[in-house]
């Protein structure tokens, strides 16, 4: 589950036809000096402990009117369904990145570590990779009038998020043996759902949150300014600014039953921001499912689940490219991608080329299956118009229907390997 200078006048002219590769960004609101973060009696609090699951069917909400960050599964998850809150950012250079995901998920209960975990990746320009998959004792999600907040904590470490109800601001904090600090996010994009419709409290189509059968999605922040400031246990400070966003995922079953793989992208180029999901579904009617959002100066241009050419509906086309310099280690050897967003009603198209430039993380599952994350160079814009250059993050996966438990122990079980986990994961990614 995926941002160069703020000067607007930087223009590089190339050979005829004249095209301006410009670098600029949407202007997000400044992060406030303080956020109201007090939990009181006006808040509804959902608590979940590490080994708590609901026996039998529970309440699984697919409502398009519920706030995107609200708890979707009540009173708690059961043995199959799960939910996740995800936040990510990439530096303006594209060399440093951060991804943080909070999950309530019993998919890997056989580890004996519980159902609460935090996935945490930081990649730095010098090649340093910090990978955390931390199993936590308890989690709280507070749904308050002005914000939604979550805390995943154990006696010696804590991770938290705080998102305002208007989806403009988010603050993330982490305090563990490996890294301490946080990051802020400021966005002026409106929240949207999987079908491209804007989220409103009045609701939308009944299936508006569904990407593929069993998998549901809300886009809280399509594009946001990100400011990261953290310190490693070694004393080294990590600080960068960039672009990123936030998404919500919840599903009826584990990933291996839901799909054989996915490709996820968050990118920006000049005033454009792109968020795209491509899922090869296994449930219901197996096949390819897409959800794409294209913003211009933080206003939605195209939002659609249509992945083929249409004369009437907005659509998005996606193609893998193989002519670049960098690919993943596993079966999928693409070196980049091309996106084409189209709006027949506006008689306009937008095209963007994305090329992998940095491998951020990889995890293998054997026999060529696995997951790869990349930082990317992005170039594009309106067809026949000004072209812009930017950066992006992508993640691609390809999974078998079944993974032997010993391999899952290696791939996902590193959360309790202790301080040597990063070195173990590097070794595992090459072995598998």
UniProtKB/Swiss-Prot annotation:
UniProt keyword list: Glycoprotein, Isomerase, Signal, Virulence
Family annotation (InterPro entries): DA_C
EC number: 5.5.1.-
Positions annotated as glycosylated: 59, 78, 153, 308
Listed GO MF terms: isomerase activity
Metabolic or biological pathway, per its Swiss-Prot or TrEMBL entry: Mycotoxin biosynthesis
Domain of life assignment: Eukaryota
Presence of keyword Signal: yes
Family as reported in the entry's similarity comment: Belongs to the Diels-Alderase family.
Role this protein plays: Hexane cyclase; part of the gene cluster that mediates the biosynthesis of pyrrocidines, fungal natural products containing a macrocyclic para-cyclophane connected to a decahydrofluorene ring system that show potent antibiotic activities toward Gram-negative bacteria. Within the pathway, pydB functions synergistically with pydE, pydX and pydZ to form the cyclophane.
Protein name as annotated: Hexane cyclase pydB
Organism, as annotated: Acremonium sp
Lineage: Eukaryota, Fungi, Dikarya, Ascomycota, Pezizomycotina
């Amino acid at each position: 589950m995926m941002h160069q200078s703020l000067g607007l006048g930087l223009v590089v002219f190339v050979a005829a036809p004249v095209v301006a590769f410009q670098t600029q960004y949407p202007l997000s609101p400044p992060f406030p000096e303080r956020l109201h973060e007090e939990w009181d009696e006006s808040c509804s609090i959902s608590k979940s402990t590490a080994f708590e699951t609901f026996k039998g069917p529970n309440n699984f909400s697919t409502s398009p009117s519920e706030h995107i960050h609200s708890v979707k599964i009540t009173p708690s998850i059961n043995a199959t369904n799960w939910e996740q809150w995800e936040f990510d950012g990439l530096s303006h250079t594209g060399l440093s990145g951060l991804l943080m995901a909070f999950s309530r998920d019993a998919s890997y209960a056989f580890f004996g570590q519980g159902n609460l975990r935090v996935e945490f990746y930081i990649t730095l320009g010098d090649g340093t990779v910090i990978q955390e998959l931390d199993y936590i004792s308890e989690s709280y999600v507070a749904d308050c009038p002005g914000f939604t907040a979550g805390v995943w904590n154990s006696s010696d470490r804590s991770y938290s998020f705080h998102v305002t109800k208007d989806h403009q601001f988010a603050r993330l904090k982490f305090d563990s043996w490996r890294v301490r600090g946080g990051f802020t996010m400021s966005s002026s994009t409106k929240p949207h759902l999987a079908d491209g419709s804007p989220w409103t409290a009045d609701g939308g189509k009944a299936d508006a949150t569904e990407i593929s059968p069993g998998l549901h999605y809300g886009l809280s922040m399509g594009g946001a300014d990100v400011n990261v400031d953290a310190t490693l246990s070694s004393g080294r400070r990590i600080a960068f600014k960039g672009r990123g966003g936030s998404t919500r995922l919840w599903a009826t079953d584990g990933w291996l039953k839901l799909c054989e793989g996915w490709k996820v992208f968050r990118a920006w180029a000049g005033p454009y921001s792109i968020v795209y999901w491509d899922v090869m579904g296994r449930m219901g009617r197996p096949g390819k499912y897409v959800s794409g959002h294209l913003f211009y100066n933080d206003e939605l241009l195209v939002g659609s689940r249509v992945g083929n050419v249409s004369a009437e509906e907005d659509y998005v086309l996606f193609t893998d490219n193989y002519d670049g310099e960098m690919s993943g280690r596993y079966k999928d050897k693409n070196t980049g991608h091309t996106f084409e967003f189209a709006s027949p009603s506006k008689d306009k198209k937008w095209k963007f080329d994305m090329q992998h430039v940095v491998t951020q993380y990889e995890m293998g599952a054997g026999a060529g299956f696995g997951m790869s994350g990349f930082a990317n160079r992005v170039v594009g814009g309106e067809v026949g118009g000004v072209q812009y250059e930017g950066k992006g993050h992508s993640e691609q996966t390809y999974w078998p229907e079944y993974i032997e438990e010993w391999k899952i122990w290696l791939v996902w079980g590193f959360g309790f390997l202790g301080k040597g986990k990063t070195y173990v994961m590097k070794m595992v990614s090459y072995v598998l």
